[in-house]
């Protein structure tokens, strides 16, 4: 219900979609506020392509339509997940059942995809903007996708994606991974860093191309997030497709990523916040402990006001 509310609260422009060619065999599809990627040669045969992430709730038919346009009646080999936050799993159940495919994720992400653990609470006190202030509404699980969920291979290979490697990039969440193809420098980032200011509704609407750290309100370990950004910057990718924002490529993108890695503490980490003071602790069972919340009375009042305004706008949109 909360996921549907989020979709309704966003103006109609975010319901739009944009397809961007990342490489000849990688298509980035924007589904509202988050991207999914279709990996495989156009016209690939049955079980010869892969979906990366599963978007926000309400875009199942859009994703399947794009897959039909690109691959005909061919089904994917699997769905691979960068991580399991609500905006990346919104269509996961419907798609995995319709296609009859397994779901792969890092071992540390499995508790959140198999009903064993909820994610730590988001922190609405960091980042500013309606997306951050609204974050307590976002579903955090547990989500349970049953026996379809499997761990990524320990050898770093990616099922259904020959030539690709998965890289553990924790911080945003414990089992976050990115996907890397060294032959041509294509990097599928997930939310280890993003290319729009995801905390701001205005930035999300405009999709301004700019490199930022992981979404602040849902990042639970800032030291790990810093190390992950540095590891990705060290790859010197040719093109980076992130979970939020447009794909970026070339020297300008690399310079921005290098700057983010170098000045991560000032550019990405909030000055204060629940997980700035101490990280959430997780293991293969899921969330073990979380630090106490940071209370900000002024921010709370502003958040309630913003939420009320959003509900009014959403109600008016539904009456149209």
Show the residue positions of the predicted features.
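Metallo-beta-lactamase
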Residues: 8-9, 56-57, 109-170, 174-251
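Conserved beta-strand hairpin/beta-sheet module of binuclear metal-dependent hydrolase folds
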Residues: 12-71, 179-190, 195
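Residue-level marker for buried hydrophobic side chains located in beta-strands
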Residues: 50-52, 80, 103, 186-188, ...
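Active-site metal-binding motif and surrounding structural segment of the metallo-beta-lactamase
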Residues: 60-105
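C-terminal/domain-terminus segments
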Residues: 122-134, 163, 239-272
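Short, flexible loop segments at boundaries between secondary-structure elements
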Residues: 264-286
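Hydrophobic alpha-helical topogenic segments used for membrane insertion/localization
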Residues: 292-319
């Amino acid at each position: 219900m909360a996921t549907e509310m989020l979709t309704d609260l966003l103006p109609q422009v975010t319901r739009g979609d944009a397809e961007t060619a990342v490489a000849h065999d990688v298509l980035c599809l924007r589904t509202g506020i988050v991207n999914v990627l279709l990996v495989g040669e156009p016209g690939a045969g049955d079980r010869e392509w892969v979906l990366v992430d599963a978007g926000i709730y309400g875009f199942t038919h859009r994703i399947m339509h794009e897959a039909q346009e690109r691959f005909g009646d061919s089904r994917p080999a699997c769905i691979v997940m960068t991580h399991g936050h609500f905006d990346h799993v919104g269509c996961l159940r419907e798609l995995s059942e319709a296609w009859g495919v397994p779901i792969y994720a890092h071992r540390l992400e499995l508790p959140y995809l198999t009903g064993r653990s909820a994610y730590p609470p988001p922190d609405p006190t960091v980042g500013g903007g309606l997306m951050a202030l609204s974050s307590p509404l976002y579903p955090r699980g547990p989500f349970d996708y049953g026996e379809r969920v499997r761990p990524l291979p320990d050898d770093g290979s990616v099922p259904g994606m020959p030539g690709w490697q998965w890289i553990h990039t924790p911080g945003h969440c414990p089992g976050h991974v990115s996907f890397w193809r060294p032959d041509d420098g294509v990097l599928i980032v997930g939310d280890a860093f993003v290319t729009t200011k995801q905390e701001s509704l205005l930035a999300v609407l405009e999709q301004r191309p700019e490199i930022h750290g992981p979404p602040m309100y849902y990042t639970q370990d800032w030291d790990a997030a810093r190390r992950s950004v540095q590891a990705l910057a060290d790859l010197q990718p040719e093109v980076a497709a992130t979970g939020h924002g447009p794909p970026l490529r070339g020297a300008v993108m690399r310079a921005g990523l290098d700057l983010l890695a170098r000045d991560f503490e000032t550019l990405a980490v909030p000055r204060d916040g629940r997980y700035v003071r101490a990280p959430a602790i997780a293991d293969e069972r899921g969330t073990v402990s979380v630090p106490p919340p940071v209370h900000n009375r002024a921010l709370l009042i502003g958040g309630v006001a913003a939420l009320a305004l959003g509900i009014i706008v959403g109600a008016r949109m539904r009456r149209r």
